[in-house]
Design a protein with these regions (language model features):
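Bacterial signal peptide processing site
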Residues: 44-46
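C-terminal motif of bacterial Sec signal peptides marking the signal peptidase cleavage site
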Residues: 39-42
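Active-site recognition of the HExxH zinc-binding catalytic motif
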Residues: 154-167
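Acidic/histidine-rich, surface-exposed loop or edge segments in extracytoplasmic proteins
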Residues: 59-78
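Auxiliary, metal-adjacent structural segments of Zn-dependent hydrolase domains
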Residues: 82-131
Length: 285
C-alpha cells in the first residue's frame, strides 16, 4: 500500500500517551519507515527503467533496441534475445532493399495486454524519423515468443518501409487525406508480404468490389476521419477500409505498370493512384 501521510499523521495525533521515551521511539520508527519507503521507491524506479541494446551493424546503419519493462509486465531474457535477433536480421534485410532507410534507427518494444491476434500478436507504428514502437501482446496464444516468431519480422518490414518513405506520425513528409494514407499503408503492407511471406488475411484482404471502395475514398474530403476510414470500424460495419483498399491500389498499380513494389515505393501517392486506375481495372489478388 502507498504511504498515506494523512492517515499516519492522524494516528500519531490520536495517541496522547505521555512520556519522552515513547515520543522518542515513535520518532525513530517514523524515520525508519521513511527510509524503507525511500529504498522501495528507488528500487521500483530502477526496475521501470527501460533497458536498451545498442547494435553496430555492418554497413552504414546503427540500431538501438529499447525494452520498456514495468513492475508487472515486461520481457524475459530469452524473449529479449529472440526479439533482438529478429529485429537485427530484419533491419539488415530491409536496409539492403530500401536505401532511404535512416542511418540510425531506434526500436522501442513494449508489452500490451490487448488482443491483436488479427496481425499475429505484434503491432507497431513509426513514431518519428528513425523511431519505431513495437507492441507485443501478452494475450497472444503461446505468448510473446510465439507472437515474435510469427509476426515480428513482418511488422518490422512494414514499419521500416514507413521510415524509408517518410510516412511517420511526427515529421511526416506527406499531405493529409485518406487516399494518401491508403497508398502508403498499402505499399508497406505489400512490401512486408512479398519479402517475408507473411499475410494476415483477416486484416488486409479486399473484396471483389474493391474498385468501388477506391472511388469512395477518392471522393472523401481531405479531413475525413482517419479512424473511421483507415483502421477503425465504419458505421456500415466494414473495418480497416483504407488498409484493404491500399493493398488493392498497390496490386493494381503493379499489374497495370509492370513495376515492382520497390519501384512503386519511390513514387508519389498520386502517381501510384494513376497507375492503379489505368487500364481495364482487373482485380489482382
Amino acid at each position: 500500500m502507498r504511504f498515506d501521510p494523512a492517515r499516519n499523521s492522524h494516528s500519531r495525533l490520536a495517541d496522547g500517551t505521555p512520556g519522552r521515551r515513547r515520543r522518542y521511539m515513535k520518532k525513530i520508527l517514523l524515520v525508519s519507515f521513511w527510509l524503507v519507503l525511500s529504498i522501495q521507491a528507488s528500487c521500483s524506479e530502477e526496475h521501470r527503467q527501460p533497458q536498451s541494446s545498442d547494435i553496430s551493424l555492418e554497413g552504414a546503419g546503427s540500431l538501438t533496441i529499447i525494452f520498456e519493462d514495468g513492475a508487472d509486465t515486461g520481457f524475459s531474457d530469452d524473449e529479449k534475445q529472440l526479439i533482438t535477433d529478429l529485429v537485427t536480421h530484419a533491419e539488415q534485410d530491409v536496409r539492403a532493399l530500401l536505401h532511404t532507410l535512416p542511418d540510425a534507427i531506434e526500436v522501442t518494444a513494449i508489452v500490451i495486454d490487448r488482443n491483436v491476434d488479427i496481425v499475429g500478436g505484434v503491432t507497431g507504428r513509426a513514431d518519428a524519423p528513425g523511431k519505431v514502437l513495437i507492441e507485443f501482446s501478452s494475450a497472444f496464444p503461446g505468448g510473446i515468443s510465439a507472437a515474435a516468431k510469427g509476426a515480428l519480422s513482418s511488422t518490422i518490414f512494414h514499419e521500416f518501409h514507413h521510415l524509408a518513405r517518410g510516412w511517420t506520425i511526427q515529421g511526416n513528409k506527406f499531405g493529409a487525406g485518406i487516399p494518401i494514407a491508403a497508398v502508403n499503408e498499402g505499399l508497406a503492407t505489400v512490401f512486408a508480404e512479398e519479402y517475408t511471406g507473411v499475410y494476415f488475411e483477416a486484416a488486409y484482404s479486399y473484396p471483389q468490389n474493391a474498385a468501388e471502395w477506391l472511388q469512395e475514398i477518392l471522393a472523401l474530403p481531405v479531413d475525413a476521419d482517419y479512424s473511421t476510414w483507415m483502421m477503425g470500424e465504419h458505421p456500415d460495419g466494414r473495418n480497416s477500409i483504407g488498409y484493404r483498399v491500399g493493398r488493392y491500389i498497390v496490386h493494381q498499380a503493379i499489374a497495370n505498370s509492370g513495376k515492382s513494389i520497390l519501384e512503386l515505393s519511390g513514387l508519389a501517392p498520386n502517381e501510384i493512384l494513376r497507375l492503379a486506375e489505368k487500364g481495364s481495372g482487373k482485380m489482382v489478388g
